[in-house]
Amino acid sequence: MRPLTDTCPKPLLQVRGQPLMLWPMQALALEGFVSQLVNTAWLGEVIEDYFLSKTSHLPSQNKHSLLLNSEHVDIQFSHEGRDFGGALETAGGIIRALPQLDMAFWVVAGDVFMPNFEFSRAVFQKFVRSEALAHIWLVPNPPHNPRGDFGLSPSGQALNLFRDAGHTLYTFSTVALYKKALFAPPFCAVPAGNPQGIKFALAPLLRAAMDAGRVTAQLFEGEWTDVGTPERLALLNSAT
């Protein structure tokens, strides 16, 4: 995304009139998910300063309160870049933040645009009651990922399938529900809080949990964009 991200972290790039990361934060608030954590790496201090300028600080709780869609949202931060000099990859960052999270929680990447996605409270509660350790949303494959990532069974199980075996695969949207137990043995040996700053990719962990039958999924066919290039960003902002 350079040169755009030389001075502005990707989640703060403007998409249709507001920072990219505010779209999912507002959607979460609409469903009553008002305790949110922002995980930062590149230019993390710029992200925190942005929210500091718009929030009231709650020093006793190390939180900041922000008004989104008439809902007061409490925002916490987990700073990979400040603490370890760079990003810890997706799973490593989640594990770093685990002590600040509830037993089940939403995750969405800061560089995807899904303006019509509903962070459903009913789906969340169903997931909490289930045996699944993860529930992920898949999307039809975009041009930049034509082979897809994971399969989907008729019963809603996410499948760890080989891309070259003729299976129908879909792209992982990055939106997911997780339980803390996914980031613990036997699937993960990195301790909660990731005190050593170990880089840990999410896909191998998810694939292992899929093989154990512990990951469910569903297909999202609404608007979705991985805002990974200046051209994709420009295309989004040119849409009417």
Language-model features: locations:
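A phosphate-binding catalytic loop at a beta-strand-loop-alpha-helix junction
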Residues: 1-4
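Conserved beta-strand segments of alpha/beta enzyme cores
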Residues: 11, 74-76, 133, 157, ...
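Conserved N-terminal catalytic core of the sugar/cofactor nucleotidyltransferase
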Residues: 14, 18-108, 119, 185, ...
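Conserved beta-strand termini and adjacent loop/short-helix elements that scaffold enzyme active sites
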Residues: 41, 78-80, 137, 161, ...
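Catalytic-core segments of class I nucleotidyltransferases/pyrophosphorylases
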Residues: 105-106, 113, 117-129, 141-144, ...
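Short beta-strand-to-loop element that shapes/binds the nucleotide-sugar donor at the catalytic cleft/hinge
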Residues: 134-149
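Short acidic-glycine loop/turn motifs at beta-strand connectors
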Residues: 151-157
